[in-house]
Amino acid sequence: MKTKTEYRMEKGLHKIAEKIYWNFGDNFGYAFQGAPLTMFVYDFDKDTFHEKEVLKIRLWQDKYHIFKRLPTGNYKTLGATAEADKLYSYIKKACNV
């Protein structure tokens, strides 16, 4: 049984799955059509994404900063948490990876 947060996150990821190329390597990276290497913030209240340098996903009451783009173009993991692991799973599932 999915929680409301899990359901809404998966729904949001499905909205952008067709427009994004995901690369699950040592560094998490992707290119968005028309805006390469852009990160997104998912706003649960407005059910939409906002472009940002840092990917922030709001889970429960806190915001977890999962990845940050470095000047070299690589990505740095800012935290390895159970929430981050769940996020990876949702993204992979939503993007059929």
Regions found by a protein language model. Name each.
Residues 1-49, 69, 73-74:
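Negatively charged, low-complexity tracts enriched in Asp/Glu with abundant Ser/Thr
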Residues 47-93, 97:
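Intrinsically disordered, low-complexity regulatory segments enriched in Ser/Thr/Pro
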